[in-house]
């Protein structure tokens, strides 16, 4: 899950929270802040604290992220305790989750018991642990939830790009791969598959607008986020 920085609130604020959609997409790109899919239309302005339970934050810039319909629906409107979860705008979430062959997501190894609980809770909250064949029937996706399929397809696509890079490395090819990644989304998958190459890691960080640069060191390696739990 890509760590993001939305930047300062636009001058004048918002009379209607839906008006924040365009500024958010300008700041963060047209990607779901949770599953990372590129969503060209109908992106929801996501309230981190549900608007029904914390109406005071209805139009608060710092309470906004972007969400696809699947992540938004899974998260719902139930009151939550922010400290029980990990958030891409306050934590270095790229360190908390591991993307694996086939596009599966799991808590990253070695993150410690406290962060592990938060990572597991975050996956359950957003339904990121849902995939066909899950031993728990409640954690299998509906027919309308194709996030797992998108991750699998992007993993395969990224692996092909990696193979081309290893076979015929060039600046032009590196730029083309980043262009493809930015157009398709799923930062975490690209960062995992191309993570062996520091230059490509840095190009991904630079290419995906709104990526929090404080979450990476000079070698483009993920580091603890200042003020975050990871």
Q: At which residue positions do the language-model features occur?
A:
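Generic recognition of cysteine residues
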Residues: 32-35, 74, 209, 215
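A generic structural signal for short, solvent-exposed coil/turn residues
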Residues: 24, 37-40, 89-91, 97, ...
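Histidine-centered nuclease catalytic patch
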Residues: 13-14, 34-67, 75-97
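Alpha-helix initiation and capping sites
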Residues: 58-65, 91, 113, 141, ...
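C-terminal, charged low-complexity interaction regions
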Residues: 123-230
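Short, charged surface segments at domain edges that flank catalytic/cofactor-binding sites
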Residues: 1-31, 54-62, 158-159, 163, ...
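PEST-like low-complexity intrinsically disordered regions enriched in Ser/Thr/Pro and acidic residues
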Residues: 76, 80-86, 91-96, 100-129, ...
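Phosphate-binding glycine-rich loops of NTP-binding sites
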Residues: 70
């Amino acid at each position: 899950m890509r760590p993001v920085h939305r930047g300062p609130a636009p001058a004048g604020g918002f009379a209607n929270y839906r008006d924040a959609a365009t500024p958010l997409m300008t700041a963060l790109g047209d990607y779901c802040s949770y599953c990372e899919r590129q969503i060209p239309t109908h992106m929801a302005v996501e309230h981190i604290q549900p608007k029904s339970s914390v109406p005071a934050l209805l139009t608060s810039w710092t309470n906004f992220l972007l969400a696809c319909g699947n992540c938004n629906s899974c998260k719902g409107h139930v009151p939550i305790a922010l400290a029980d979860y990990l958030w891409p705008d306050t934590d270095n979430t790229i360190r908390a989750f591991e993307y694996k062959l086939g596009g599966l997501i799991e808590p990253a190894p070695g993150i410690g018991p406290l962060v592990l609980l938060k990572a597991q809770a975050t996956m359950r909250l957003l339904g990121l642990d849902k995939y066909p064949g899950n031993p728990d029937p409640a954690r299998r996706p509906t027919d309308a939830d194709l996030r797992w399929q998108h991750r699998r397809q992007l993993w395969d696509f990224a692996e092909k790009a990696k193979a081309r890079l290893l076979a015929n490395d060039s600046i032009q090819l590196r730029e083309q791969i980043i262009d493809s990644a930015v157009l398709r989304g799923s930062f975490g998958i690209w960062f995992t598959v191309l993570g062996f190459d520091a230059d490509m890691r840095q190009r991904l960080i630079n290419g995906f607008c709104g990526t929090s640069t404080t979450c990476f060191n000079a070698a483009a390696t993920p580091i603890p986020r200042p003020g975050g739990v990871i």
